[in-house]
Curated annotation (Swiss-Prot):
A double ring-shaped homohexamer of HslV is capped on each side by a ring-shaped HslU homohexamer. The assembly of the HslU/HslV complex is dependent on binding of ATP. PANTHER family: ATP-DEPENDENT CLP PROTEASE ATP-BINDING SUBUNIT CLPX-LIKE, MITOCHONDRIAL-RELATED (PTHR48102), ATP-DEPENDENT PROTEASE ATPASE SUBUNIT HSLU (PTHR48102:SF3). Gene3D superfamilies: 1.10.8.60, P-loop containing nucleotide triphosphate hydrolases. NCBIfam families: hslU, PRK05201.1. Pfam families: AAA, AAA_2. Belongs to the ClpX chaperone family. HslU subfamily. One of its GO terms (biological process) is proteolysis involved in protein catabolic process. This is ATP-dependent protease ATPase subunit HslU. ATPase subunit of a proteasome-like degradation complex; this subunit has chaperone activity. The binding of ATP and its subsequent hydrolysis by HslU are essential for unfolding of protein substrates subsequently hydrolyzed by HslV. HslU recognizes the N-terminal part of its protein substrates and unfolds these before they are guided to HslV for hydrolysis.
Amino acid sequence: MTDLTPREIVSELDRFIIGQKDAKRAVAVALRNRWRRKQLSDDLREEVYPKNILMIGPTGVGKTEISRRLAKLARAPFIKVEATKFTEVGYVGRDVEQIIRDLVENAITMTRDHMREEVKANAHQAAEERVIEAIAGSDAREATREMFRKKLKAGELDDTVIELEVADTSNPMSMFEIPGQPGMNPMGGGMDLVELFGKAFGGRTVRKKLTVAQSYEVLISEEADKLLDDEAVNRSAVTAVEQNGIVFLDEIDKVCARSDARGADVSREGVQRDLLPLIEGTTVSTKYGPVKTDHVLFIASGAFHIAKPSDLLPELQGRLPIRVELRPLTEQDFVRILTETDNALTLQYTALMGTESVTVTFAEDGIAALARIAAEVNQSVENIGARRLYTVMERVFEELSFAAPDRSGDEITVDAEFVEANLGALTRDTDLSRYVL
């Protein structure tokens, strides 16, 4: 669990997302409240429930990006799901309880990786012994083993090919998986058939030829797993989900039944009804045991283009008490997105062209022109936010990307003239830009 302060969380999010101060602050406070709750006495801790968040804003303004960055910051079990992927209980498809099962699976992986780090030193030693045995043989004298150990540590044996008995990781029962729902148990929480048969066929080993360098990763992973207590991993992961789990529910507006809607849309309310107990707090049965969702934090987001937040079921609105509105992006925001973020498209295209030995530099007027065109097309066609920059940049670099291998050593300056030459005609022809940009 992260112990960053709200100010630190916001400044970390600022590196990748421009603007949206309110949304960042709400998310930062929610994350910090997880840490605060852990400092309380046991009886009070049980009474403090998370305040779930509803983020409302047009497409392409940073809702999903906030969730993606939050997942890396949280250091807690985290899952991002689209509400549209789920169906009402009783219909074919995934029911909403699968969200918690997937969250537990993520937590198991995270906990296992964390615990592996703790036993890595011992696992490394055991892996070293197995490599030496594969090279020198099991009946080699201690002096011989010591000689190989020195060579191994010096990296002299990295390219030597050895034959090892390693665990067979292939799943012999994968053919029995349900199409479209890999590894999922149609019956809900218990152990699924694939896993059951997988365990029956488990414990098999195969002989593999690997170089010493390649074998280390495989062997360390195997030896670490031998040192881990599966029961402790599962227990720790379930506790982490119950106390610190975070679920990001994207596209929540797509399961709203609009007040004027008729027919199939109305059945979407079933998904909302199924979400109610999950968000309020219920017990979900998983193959690792029952999981209580009382203290899982839910962050829902939606564009609410057609539906309105008031079209959500009143009970669901009540379970998402913190409302945050994200504002549409302006031309000035686009300039900042292209220059200030750590993963700016300008940096990406410069690096991509650099692989072909083409040096690309962006002039200030070039960046301003890109931002202006993106903002204009958003206004005149459809406002898709920062995603418009992808389309504009791709069109500007289309010719250069194609010819780059033949232009090795060239230096290109992306200024207003370059942007105009590659995009000008399209932006002036509104009908054409409607389809191309």
